[in-house]
A protein has these predicted regions:
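Carbohydrate-binding surface patches
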Residues: 27, 534-571
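Conserved, mostly hydrophobic/aromatic
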Residues: 30, 137, 198, 208, ...
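Glycan-association/targeting regions that enable binding to alpha-glucans and other polysaccharides
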Residues: 1-130, 204
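Hydrophobic faces of well-ordered beta-strands that scaffold small-molecule active sites
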Residues: 133-135, 206-208, 252-254, 343, ...
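C-terminal beta-strand-rich structural cap/linker in extracellular carbohydrate-active enzymes
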Residues: 32-34, 79, 133, 584-611
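Active-site-proximal substrate-binding groove within the catalytic cores of carbohydrate-active enzymes
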Residues: 427-526, 563
Length: 611
C-alpha cells in the first residue's frame, strides 16, 4: 500500500467529478499515511505553462486528510499531481495510474499527471437532437427511387454495376490511382422512398455523406458546393427530402467537406471540366487562385495527405472564408436556408480553430442547428499539427463522431480487455468530456471509413445484437450506419460500402435496432443520465445510466457460456443506487451472448453521494 491515497472518481477526494467550467474551483483532498509531513500540495499545469502549487490544509478531525481548492479561471487542458514534503526525507509524488487511482513515486520525472478538462460554456442542445436516433446513408449505395431504377446524371469515364448484389471494387491504373469511378445509382428520391422504412425502424434523423456535385462516388472531392450532384438528383429533390423529413418529425445533417476540393472542381479545374481557361490550375488571375498553395504551378500543390485528387484549400483566405460561412450567399447559408438541421465536418482536425468558430457562428444564427466534427481520438486532448484543439470548450463543436466509444465496444466484445479495464476506459472518457459534449457526441458502430461491425465481430449476430444494445445505452447520440441493421458485411473501403440488400435483410438485427430505438425514446436516463459501471465477478458488465430520479441497468454477458451475477463492484455509482441494483440483480444467471435491460424504481438517487 502507498502512503498517499486518492481517487479522482470519488467525491470524497475530488468535487466535482469530471470536467470543470472555467471560473469554478475544484475541491481536492488526499489522505496521507506517513509521519513528519511538512507540506501537502497539488501541482496544476496548463498546457505549455508553469506549474502552480496549491497548498492543502490538514483536517482538524481527520489528521490524515488534507484538503484545498484548485482555482481555474480559463478554459483549456490542465494536468495535476500531488506532492508531499516530509522532514528529513525525500518528497513523495502521486500521479495517475489507472481509472481514478494514483501511483506513488519519489521521482518527479516518473509522475504521470491526472487530466482536468476545463471548458468555457455548455450550450443546451436542440430538443430534436437530444431525442435523436441517427441513420448514416452513403447515398450511392442506399436506394434508387426512380420508377424503373434508371440512373440519373451518368458521368463520363465511369462504370455502373450490373446488379446491386455486385461487390464494390476499385479499378486502378498503372500508377495505382483510380482509373474510373464505380456507381450503383442510389439517389435522393431513393431516400425519400425509404423514409417509411426508416421511421418504422425508429430513426428520427439522417446523416448523409456528401451530396454536392463531385467526380467520385463518395463525393469528398467536391466540384461545386452549391449544386446537388446530378446522379443524386436535383435541388428540387433535395427540397422534397427536407420537406418530407420535417413533416415526419425527422431531421437532416449534411457532410461539410471544407478542407479540400476536387482536382476537377470549378475552383481548381485541372481537368478543364468547367472550361479551358477557368479555375486556379488554369488561370493565375482566377478569383480562386489564392485559395490554393502551389509549389510548382500548376502541377505541384498542397493536397490532403498527398492525394493529388484533393487539393487543400487555404482556410485563412478571406475570400474562401466568406464563401463557406459568410452571412450572405455562402455555402452554409444557402443550405441552412433550405432547411438543413446541422453539419458533420469532415477532417475537423484540418480546420483551424477560428474557422470552426465561424462555422458555429453561422449556424447559431438559426434555431436548433447542430455541429459535429470528425475526430478519431479523445477530443479533450486532441493535438493536430502541434496545436491542442479546443473542441470541448463550448464555442465550436457540439460533439464529435465518437470513434473512441466504437473501439471500446469492439474491444469489449472481442475480449481484448478484461471488464475492470473496460469500465475504467469508458469512465475515463466520461471524466474527460464536459457532460453536454459527451451527450452530444455521435456514437457509431461503423461508418464509411471503418469495417462493418458484423465483420469486425467475426460474423457473430449475437455479438452484434449486444453491440446495438450498448450503442443505445451508452452516453451520446446513437447513429446506425446504413445496412448494419440488415446484416451487411464488409471489410475495408470499398467493401464497407456495399449496396443495401433490399429484400434480403437480417430481420433479427432489424428487430433489435427497432427495440432499442423505442427504449431510448422512453427512458430519460438514456438521454440525460450520468454513467456508471458495475462488474460482476469479471463475467458480467453492467452499464448504468442515472438521473436524480430514474435509472437503467444494461447487463452484458459477452461470453459463450452462462454467467452468474455475483461479487458486484461499482464505479461512479451512488451508494443508494448500488443498493437498489444489488437487490434487483444479485444471483441472476445469464445465458451466453445475452443482455438484460432493467429500469430501476428509485425514488431519489443522490447523485452527489460518494461511491
Amino acid at each position: 500500500m502507498g502512503q498517499i491515497h486518492y481517487n479522482a472518481w470519488r467525491l470524497e477526494f475530488k468535487q466535482p467529478f469530471g470536467a470543470l467550467q472555467a471560473g469554478n474551483n475544484v475541491q481536492s483532498s488526499v489522505r496521507v499515511d506517513c509521519q513528519n509531513v511538512t507540506q501537502v500540495a497539488v501541482g496544476v499545469t496548463k498546457l505549455d505553462e508553469n506549474t502552480v502549487f496549491y497548498p492543502l490544509t490538514q483536517d482538524e478531525d481527520e489528521s490524515d486528510k488534507y484538503t484545498g481548492e484548485i482555482k481555474i479561471t480559463t478554459s483549456g487542458l490542465y494536468h495535476y499531481y500531488f506532492r508531499v514534503r516530509r522532514e528529513n526525507d525525500a518528497a513523495l509524488y502521486l500521479g495517475h495510474l489507472h481509472g481514478g487511482l494514483g501511483k506513488e513515486t519519489t521521482d518527479i520525472s516518473k509522475v504521470e499527471p491526472f487530466q482536468l478538462t476545463c471548458y468555457d460554456r455548455q450550450v443546451p442542445r436542440p430538443e430534436w437532437y437530444r431525442n435523436a436516433v441517427f441513420y448514416q446513408i452513403f447515398p450511392d449505395r442506399f436506394a434508387n427511387g426512380n420508377p424503373h431504377g434508371e440512373i440519373d446524371g451518368k458521368k463520363p469515364n465511369t462504370f455502373l454495376y450490373a446488379t446491386t448484389d455486385d461487390r464494390p471494387m476499385y479499378i486502378y491504373d498503372e500508377n495505382h490511382k483510380i482509373a474510373r469511378w464505380d456507381f450503383y445509382g442510389g439517389n435522393l428520391r431513393g431516400i425519400i422512398a425509404k423514409l417509411p422504412y426508416l421511421k418504422r425502424l425508429g430513426v428520427t434523423a439522417l446523416y448523409l455523406n456528401p451530396i454536392f456535385e463531385a467526380s467520385s462516388n463518395h463525393r469528398y472531392d467536391t466540384n461545386d458546393y452549391l449544386k446537388i450532384d446530378p446522379m443524386l438528383g436535383t435541388e428540387e429533390d433535395f427540397k422534397m427530402l427536407v420537406t418530407m423529413l420535417h413533416e415526419n418529425d425527422m431531421h437532416l445533417i449534411l457532410d461539410g467537406v471544407f478542407n479540400h476540393v476536387g482536382k476537377n472542381s470549378r475552383y481548381f479545374n485541372a481537368g478543364h471540366l468547367y472550361g479551358e481557361q477557368t479555375g486556379a490550375a488554369n488561370d493565375k488571375n482566377s478569383s480562386y487562385y489564392e485559395w490554393f498553395n502551389f509549389k510548382h504551378y500548376p502541377d505541384q500543390y498542397d493536397c490532403w495527405w498527398g492525394v493529388d485528387d484533393l487539393p487543400t484549400v487555404n482556410k485563412d483566405n478571406p475570400s474562401y472564408q466568406q464563401f463557406i460561412y459568410g452571412e450572405r450567399g455562402s455555402v452554409l447559408t444557402k443550405w441552412n436556408d433550405l432547411g438543413v438541421d446541422g453539419w458533420r465536418l469532415d477532417v475537423a482536425d484540418e480546420l483551424p480553430d477560428d474557422f470552426l468558430r465561424e462555422i458555429r457562428h453561422n449556424l447559431d444564427r438559426y434555431d436548433d442547428r447542430i455541429l459535429i466534427g470528425e475526430v478519431w481520438e479523445d477530443a479533450s486532448s486532441k493535438v493536430s499539427y502541434g496545436h491542442r484543439r479546443p473542441y470541448v470548450s463550448g464555442d465550436n463543436l457540439y460533439g464529435t463522431m465518437n470513434y473512441p466509444l466504437r473501439q471500446w465496444v469492439i474491444s469489449l466484445l472481442n475480449g481484448h480487455c478484461d471488464l475492470i479495464k473496460a469500465g475504467e476506459d469508458l469512465l475515463t472518457l466520461v471524466e474527460n468530456y464536459p457532460r453536454n459534449f459527451l451527450l452530444d457526441c455521435l456514437n457509431n458502430l461503423g461508418t464509411h471509413d471503418t469495417e462493418r461491425i458484423l465483420t469486425v465481430l467475426n460474423q457473430s449476430v449475437p455479438l452484434v445484437k449486444i453491440a446495438f444494445a450498448l450503442l443505445f445505452n451508452l452516453p451520446g447520440i446513437p447513429c446506425v450506419y446504413y445496412g448494419d441493421e440488415a446484416g451487411v458485411e464488409g471489410g475495408k473501403d470499398p467493401d464497407n460500402r456495399r449496396y443495401f440488400p433490399w429484400g434480403h435483410e437480417n430481420a433479427e438485427l432489424q428487430k433489435t435496432v427497432h427495440y432499442w430505438a423505442d427504449i431510448r425514446q422512453e427512458c430519460e436516463s438514456l438521454k440525460e443520465g450520468q454513467t456508471g459501471i458495475m462488474i460482476a465477478g469479471n463475467e458480467v458488465l453492467g452499464l448504468i445510466r442515472y438521473t436524480a430520479d430514474s435509472a437503467t441497468l444494461l447487463l452484458v454477458n459477452r461470453e459463450n457460456q452462462y454467467a452468474q451475477v455475483r461479487d458486484l463492484q461499482f464505479m461512479h455509482v451512488p451508494a443508494s443506487l448500488q443498493q437498489a441494483i444489488e437487490k434487483r440483480v444479485a444471483g441472476l444467471r445469464m445465458a451466453p451472448f445475452t443482455t438484460r435491460f432493467t429500469e430501476l424504481n428509485v425514488i431519489s438517487i443522490m447523485a452527489d453521494e460518494d461511491n
